[in-house]
Amino acid sequence: MKIEKLMALYGENGALLEELYNQYKLNPETLDKEWKSFFQEVDTNGLANGSGYTNGNGKSAVATSFTDAQAASIREMGIINLLNAYRRQGHLAAKLDPLGIQKPNRTFIDSKLHNISPADIDTVVDSETLGRVKLAEIVDLYEKVYCNTIGAEHFYLVNDEEREWLQKKMESPEFLAPLPRGIKLRLFEKLFQADYFETFLAKKYVGKKRFSLEGGESFIPLLDTIVEEAGYHQMDGLVIGMAHRGRLNVLVNIIEKPASLIFAEFEEKTDKDNLSYADVKYHLGYSNSRMTTSGKEVKLSLAFNPSHLECVDPVVTGSVRARQTLIGDKDRSKYMPILIHGDAAFAGQGVVAETLNLMNLEGYTTGGTFHIVVNNQIGFTTLPDESRSTLYATDLAKGFQIPIIHVNGDDPEAVYRVVKLGMEYRQKFKKDFIIDLVCYRRLGHNETDEPAFTQPKMYAIIKNHPPTVKLYEKRLVEEGDIPQEDIDFIKNGSMHGLEDSFQRAKEQDVKIRVDTMQGVWSKFSKDSLDSEPATKLLAEQMHGIVQALTSVPQGFTPNSKLVKLLQSRKEMAEGKIPVDWGFAEALSFGSILESGFRIRLSGQDSQRGTFSHRHAVLVDTNTNEKYIPLNHISSKQAKAEIINSSLSEFSVLGFEYGYSLSDPNALVMWEAQFGDFANSAQVIFDQFISSSEVKWQRLSGLIMLLPHGYEGQGPEHSSARLERFLQLCALDNMQVCNLTTAAQYFHLLRRQMLRNYRKPLVIVTPKSLLRFPASLSPVEDILQGAFREILIDDSGSKPDKIEKVVFSAGKVYYDLMKYKDENKIKNVALVRVEQIYPFPAKEIQSSLKTFKNAKQFVWCQEEPKNQGAWFFVRERIEELLPGNARLVYAGRHESPSPAAGHMKLHLQEQDQLVLDAFQA
């Protein structure tokens, strides 16, 4: 019998039971089988017919006629329900809020709710952890575990092993055992360091923004415990992503960045060689190695990040994935990401869910991220009931089957316990784990803000609430095993250390210096963009690559159409037919792998390719087995990962960017399904990819493939918003290309890896050109050619006969060429700008000297006038034109929408812009 129906036997539910029993006597078939079976048992046990009698207490005669065994069974179920209520809903009764504003709710663990009488509390039961004991002892244990300063949410986990493991750990005597004296002293030391650091900054730099951690100081011992546990678990490194609040504290007290450097940043003592070091101090990252008490050195990296909350999340996880790959960490136990969230941001920012969704995906898993929500119960001036629709800020994570432990920030020992639990869980199950550190914000959003304007009651409470370090000091002294002298020794050491660092920053030549070109980056340059390595492919090298790319293992059955594709690629390599874009890419990939560079390409449908042009991963039609020809070229090659991503742009691009930061020897590529959708990841483009070098001196060789081209598919499938990327271009920060031939694509990919520096590369890739005959390339262009930043086509015209030069980029060139050929125009030269940035001024100037008699100059583009490359190239090209010549525009009119939604209108516009180019 289901517990819900058995509960009906008690008290006020007797009337319902009576009604059901009468219904059973009249027509048993009208009841479900469980009730029918139950009443059959009742009749068998001798319950009298005519069940309307009640006993002296007013209870149903049915309810009073059960055997002792049945009553015992019901009592047992009540006990089970009560204990499971502690496990399931004990967090609601926990004392989590240091301020006492959020009151515990004990409704669900009320013994009366589960029909447990005072006498039942003395029932002897079997316990896995306590043995055969009275129920009262188990309830007492559960009160301490689930309803004190720790609130556990784990009962929703569908994996029985995970759920039971967590319960067993938390309910074991070891979980609540008194902490060793050394651990208590360390917790106090880190708490005091956190508290005093903020106090010190407040005194020395009055009114300066530092985004204080005050009210959440337990965050520092929490992080310190993670580092110590990482050493215990023999981890090699941790990568941390966090926003600005408490960041300076973390840099000094966790990463162990010299405090003198922090003070130098307040003093703005920037090294003259680092004038481009252009970001505020609470956005900066740092890396260091820390020796843990277990004797294991752990590398710590705090990621640089902007003020855009949570956008660093996928960047950190991507960086960790790369580090795991570099050291061969296949079980993902050596490197771990740590993400620090705010309560409002965790619930409010969509990238959090996007990043959580990557947790178990084969191409993105890191073996579990350790999440800490620094829950100060406010977002700037916004309270929780204004910023989320859930009880907890962390409720989102339940859908991803992630355990969540809430803990009161005023209990550092509870914080320590849940960190140890979380680290063990992560290492065992290779899954994310979340600690919700419930604390408060003692000051306003920043040090100049007045929080009492908007939260007067909360800040009246905060004003009178002692700091956590004071509470813990009092607790330690009262417990008696740590004398005041030991506590004072810790205090004095921390205070003197900060004062010494401050004086050094004031009096000595402490300069802010940044050197991100270390480790795997040490062989790369930050300066030269003139490097043009040979990118041609030797014939003998190509032979082995082609053999691998066009073969499948014995017994593997690809789709019949793909058999034809593989055969056609053989013919391309033999020179019988031109090389298409898909095969040009495959050849470049193969040659890059043979050179020892890893390849990682991810995006929506990237294994096949949105336009069915790639087919880098073949699928057996009989078994669904996958085969990647790129990984079977030679025994010495590097590995290729071709990944179908989740349906996300923001998190996946952020992940790949993070990956590229940690592995410059990998060709890392992100492909948008259509370039139009890239703006879903605009924060990553703006805050990281385009600006990380000038802000943080962080380099990246990430390639972004953004399908682009006007083909009548409407405003959402035509434009990668080329103009937006060009607007971001300055100081040689990245490369933007719009290619017109398969060979150009081949050489550009190889150039990206063979250069001795790394810059992001945006390629607005073709769609219809993928198979357009004129854009395909003879194999000789791959064997002998090189990437050319501009391509000139004068169709055999004599240079001195050229009167007009039409510049363009991308697919529109072929429309121009068609018109020129059809109309036998000989006095117009077409110049394709294949690399728009860095702008190829020298090459264009050289071409103009060739056409010395040209008087008219046109820029032709498919995009509307306010979009595309027009506003970017106009001044740059005009500066190169002879005399007072001006550059004339030919293209679509200005429009807020990228493209027309009807094919007829599209064709009219396309014909007109081509006509304008020749008649302008």
Curated annotation (Swiss-Prot):
GO terms for cellular component: cytosol; oxoglutarate dehydrogenase complex. This is 2-oxoglutarate dehydrogenase E1 component. SUPFAM superfamilies: Thiamin diphosphate-binding fold (THDP-binding) (SSF52518). It comes from the Bacteria. InterPro entries: 2-oxogl_dehyd_N (IPR032106), 2oxoglutarate_DH_E1 (IPR011603), 2oxoglutarate_DH_E1_bac (IPR023784), DH_E1 (IPR001017), KGD_C_sf (IPR042179), ODO-1/KGD_C (IPR031717), THDP-binding (IPR029061), Transketolase-like_Pyr-bd (IPR005475). E1 component of the 2-oxoglutarate dehydrogenase (OGDH) complex which catalyzes the decarboxylation of 2-oxoglutarate, the first step in the conversion of 2-oxoglutarate to succinyl-CoA and CO(2). The lineage of its organism: Bacteria, Pseudomonadati, Spirochaetota, Spirochaetia, Leptospirales. Homodimer. Part of the 2-oxoglutarate dehydrogenase (OGDH) complex composed of E1 (2-oxoglutarate dehydrogenase), E2 (dihydrolipoamide succinyltransferase) and E3 (dihydrolipoamide dehydrogenase); the complex contains multiple copies of the three enzymatic components (E1, E2 and E3). It catalyses: N(6)-[(R)-lipoyl]-L-lysyl-[protein] + 2-oxoglutarate + H(+) = N(6)-[(R)-S(8)-succinyldihydrolipoyl]-L-lysyl-[protein] + CO2. Signal peptide: none annotated. Its cofactor is thiamine diphosphate. Its EC number is 1.2.4.2. It is an enzyme of class 1 (oxidoreductase). One of its GO terms (molecular function) is thiamine pyrophosphate binding. Keywords: Glycolysis, Oxidoreductase, Thiamine pyrophosphate. It comes from Leptospira interrogans serogroup Icterohaemorrhagiae serovar Lai (strain 56601). CDD domains: TPP_E1_OGDC_like. Belongs to the alpha-ketoglutarate dehydrogenase family. GO terms for biological process: glycolytic process; tricarboxylic acid cycle.
